[in-house]
Curated annotation (Swiss-Prot):
Lineage, broadest ranks: Bacteria, Bacillati, Bacillota, Bacilli, Bacillales
Protein name: Alanine racemase
Source organism superkingdom: Bacteria
Organism: Listeria monocytogenes serovar 1/2a (strain ATCC BAA-679 / EGD-e)
Entry cofactors: pyridoxal 5'-phosphate
Annotated positions binding substrate: R134, M310
Amino acid sequence: MVTGWHRPTWIEIDRAAIRENIKNEQNKLPESVDLWAVVKANAYGHGIIEVARTAKEAGAKGFCVAILDEALALREAGFQDDFILVLGATRKEDANLAAKNHISLTVFREDWLENLTLEATLRIHLKVDSGMGRLGIRTTEEARRIEATSTNDHQLQLEGIYTHFATADQLETSYFEQQLAKFQTILTSLKNRPTYVHTANSAASLLQPQIGFDAIRFGISMYGLTPSTEIKTSLPFELKPALALYTEMVHVKELAPGDSVSYGATYTATEREWVATLPIGYADGLIRHYSGFHVLVGGELAPIIGRVCMDQTIIKLPREFQTGSKVTIIGKDHGNTITADDAAQYLDTINYEVTCLLNERIPRKYIH
């Protein structure tokens, strides 16, 4: 995707915020527990390479990604010796590519290990489906057979075993406890404990630090975002959001009563009012459902009017502004703030989706 460096729309990523979130989490972990930075989906929209560098500087001991291509991008960017785990499914024909690049893969089916052609040792992490219902083995028999396969094949190393909690971001813990118990049953069925046992995502690491095992997978909260609104007041430390989204007014004009804007003419002025056109739209991740939400101009709220277009959006101004005036879509402006949580609430989604939607057409600028 082409990045729009010649357009006045940009994302600022505060590296100091990422470092602070990591340090605060590390301070509550036992020294024996590693923190792995989850940088999948372009680091949740924050930029995979720069976030990985920042996380490593802050003390992260490795990285988790969703697909092999993300792991290879890290290797190509200079992370040659760092631990990298692919959490999602990888094609069998790509196993050798992962092995040659010392990338750990998730295994969740016995048949995946059959007839692999490897030129180097492949490190695998056994995924246990303890109740999430996506990927993973579900019985002790499966776990023992996969362990036996890896033991008998000198080119396979059962490096880790893990699970993922479905309700760690909820205050009610009964289902979480059921999952943990099932995982522990499968873990104890193995003859040898793998090097890495890991279960905790951001929510679990924040609320259930006792189940850190050997490593935690620190994702959404590394970026300063709360795993869910339900647990926001129960966090052990304040999270610092790292992402802000800005643009500038490229056209300012006054509407007369009866004038309409954007596709479908869904918004019509009832009085004289000032509006501005912003060079950002749903092709950038500012989806059409943002219509009716608001931005900040000079610290004041300005509603998004009419339909969000592919490349442009129109806002109603509280008064006349100069062309080129800065607009805050996510972030702080003169003491007021619009957060990813605010946008998520309006869009009826979660903060993860808000930032992940912001694609690479918007340039990232890294500060601090």
